[in-house]
């Protein structure tokens, strides 16, 4: 919900799983959120930006989280396509 100024005023904004696009429930204590830092290719230093991936507990329970994170990282260009 937004107020007249266009700011979000909700107390709880649900997250979505990056792999399955499911809403991560508030009581899903098995879910994770990980930030992968973007680095400068020439210097190898952190440039202040990162990619955020959220994985729900159901994906982790099936043992598919590592494949999902690798697939998402390849799509974002963090990992090379021929890895």
From Swiss-Prot:
GO terms for molecular function: ribosome binding; structural constituent of ribosome. InterPro entries: Ribosomal_eS21, Ribosomal_eS21_CS, Ribosomal_eS21_sf. The keyword Transmembrane helix does not apply. It is found in: Cytoplasm, Cytosol; Cytoplasm; Rough endoplasmic reticulum. Keywords: Acetylation, Cytoplasm, Endoplasmic reticulum, Ribonucleoprotein, Ribosomal protein. One of its GO terms (cellular component) is cytosolic small ribosomal subunit. Component of the small ribosomal subunit. The ribosome is a large ribonucleoprotein complex responsible for the synthesis of proteins in the cell. Component of the 40S small ribosomal subunit. This is Small ribosomal subunit protein eS21. It comes from Rattus norvegicus (Rat).
